[in-house]
C-alpha cells in the first residue's frame, strides 16, 4: 500500500502493515522500536548525504556555520533530519513530509537548504537547474550507510524470512542491477 515515508513507519509501529521498505537507514531509535532487517545495498544514495541549496547561494553556504539561524528542511523521521539536528546545530530544522514538497519549499525561499540522500540530490538537481548540491556534506557514520527493512517489534519470524531473502539476493549479486534500475527509473 503506497504511503508517505513517516506514515509508513507509523503503520508498521501500529501493526497496520507487516513491514515497510522505504530506504530506511539504521538508527538507534528505529532499532529500539522496530525489528530491522540486515543491511541491504543502497549505493551512494546512503553513504553520502547532501544539502540542496539555490544556485544563487552556492558561495554563501559552504560550511555548517554558514547555515546558523537558517531554516533547513529534512523529511520527517529520516536520517537526514537526524543529521541536520546533530551536525547543523545552529540551523533551524524544519520537518518536511515529502521530498517533493521540500524542493518546492526550497525553491520558493521558505527554507534555505534541504537535506537529502546524495543520489536523490543528483536527480533533483538534474530536474531543477536553479538548485545545486552544497559543497559541504554530512559526516555519515558507517551504520547509516546502508538500508534496512522495517517490521513491527516482535515479528521475528518475518524478520528471519526477510533476512534469508536479502542473503539470497546478496549471494546472487542482484543489488547492483536493482540499484542501477532504480536510479534510472528515478
Residue spans of the language-model regions?
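Hydrophobic residues within well-ordered alpha-helices
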Residues: 12-13, 67, 106-107, 149, ...
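Short, hydrophobic alpha-helical packing/hinge segments within bilobed ligand-binding/sensory domains
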Residues: 7-12, 102-105, 111, 120-121
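Ligand-binding clefts/hinges and TM-proximal coupling segments of bilobed small-molecule sensing domains
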Residues: 79-89, 132-138, 161-186
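A ligand-binding cleft/hinge motif common to bilobed small-molecule-binding domains
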Residues: 22-33, 83-86, 112-143
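Flexible hinge/capping segments at coil-to-helix
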Residues: 53-71
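Short beta-strand-to-loop elements that line the ligand-binding cleft
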Residues: 1-4, 74, 91-98, 105
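Periplasmic-binding protein-like
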Residues: 42-55, 122-166, 185-186
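Extracytoplasmic small-molecule ligand-binding "clamshell" domains
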Residues: 1-23
